[in-house]
């Protein structure tokens, strides 16, 4: 995507190739720049993807600094302040618009074309963000993102007025996914853009479960929907404690409430979803090792054990069953669609 912003550092900042500070989260294959003054150090990491432009700024500040920022067009941003001794503040020069970037609170922004100032307080700070393709929020998928409608429309219409969403929590699951994305970027492989898009969609999906909006969706339905998303993304690596952490409820509470409504535990539902995921994956792969990796298992042995425990079949028999069913896991015994 096109980078739509730039900034001008004060004259005392010099570009350096051997900075005195080390990055907390290096991004694989990113474009990296460092600047230093007598008192401060700033690092930029960026990666230009097809569906999103990734940026990362780390600040080591002995003195507060204000940096002018210029945007050449209105764009939709997703931001994650991963570290901050005190909030960073960005404001428009002429509009009544300001946003504070506080540790652990993410936000979506529409930054209109114009001039801004970013005030960076004394201390250590990390700000990560993505410039997003607003086309990701097309109907019907956008029905889950009502809190973004005004920003998506502002982007499409190139509104002259900047705006922001409510903030959302940035917890351990989000941080782990960001670090995973940082480690996997590789423009030299064919499916790099697919990987980036998959990771970005997961982060976007995850953000909506952190926002307490209209309360129309019951907690257990939120838990089931989040589990479905995480199984597709992480497979067997999904921990129910992560679901509980995102929704700020105990694992035992979610398990019991699920059992009351659906007559099976949340853990049972997790296994049903995972088996369904395996059933739809295994027929397309020649090697079980590929299926194990794509479905989040640490080894073929672990995949074999799971299939055997859930169906009584060997992986080979299970795969044959899916192929005989015309690649339709809904009609295969032992891989039935989880109850909705």
List each model region and its residues:
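N-terminal regulatory/effector-sensing and dimerization cores
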Residues: 32-151
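Linker/hinge segments immediately adjacent to helix-turn-helix/homeobox DNA-binding domains
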Residues: 151-162, 196-213, 241, 246, ...
């Amino acid at each position: 995507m096109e980078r739509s912003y730039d900034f001008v550092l004060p004259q005392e900042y010099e570009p350096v190739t051997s900075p005195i500070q080390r990055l907390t989260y290096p991004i694989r294959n990113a474009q990296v720049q460092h600047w230093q003054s007598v008192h401060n150090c700033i690092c930029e990491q960026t990666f230009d993807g097809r569906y999103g432009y990734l940026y990362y700024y780390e600040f080591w500040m002995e003195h507060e600094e204000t940096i002018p920022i210029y945007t050449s067009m209105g764009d939709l941003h997703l931001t994650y302040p991963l570290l901050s001794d005190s909030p960073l503040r960005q404001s428009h020069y002429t509009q009544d618009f300001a946003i504070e970037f506080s540790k652990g609170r993410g936000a979506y922004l529409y930054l209109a074309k114009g001039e801004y100032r970013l005030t960076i307080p004394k201390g250590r700070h990390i700000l990560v963000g993505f410039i997003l393709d607003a086309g990701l929020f097309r109907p019907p998928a956008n029905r889950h993102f009502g809190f973004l409608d005004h920003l998506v429309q502002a982007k499409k219409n190139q509104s002259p007025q900047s705006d922001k969403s409510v903030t959302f929590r940035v917890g351990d699951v989000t941080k782990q996914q960001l670090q995973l994305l940082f480690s996997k970027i590789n423009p030299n492989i064919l499916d790099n853009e697919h990987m980036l898009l998959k990771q970005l969609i997961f982060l976007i999906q995850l953000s909506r479960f952190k926002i307490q909006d209209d309360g129309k969706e019951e907690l257990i339905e939120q838990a089931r929907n989040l589990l479905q998303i995480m199984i597709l993304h992480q497979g067997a690596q999904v921990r129910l404690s992560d679901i509980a952490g995102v929704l700020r409820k105990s694992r035992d509470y979610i398990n019991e409430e699920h059992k009351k409504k659906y007559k099976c535990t949340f853990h049972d539902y997790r296994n049903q979803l995972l088996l369904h995921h395996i059933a739809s994956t295994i027929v397309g792969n020649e090697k079980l090792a590929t299926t194990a990796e794509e479905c989040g298992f640490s080894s073929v042995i672990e995949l074999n054990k799971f299939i055997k425990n859930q169906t009584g079949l060997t992986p080979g028999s299970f795969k044959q069953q899916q192929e005989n069913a015309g690649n339709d896991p809904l009609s295969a015994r032992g891989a039935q669609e989880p109850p909705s």
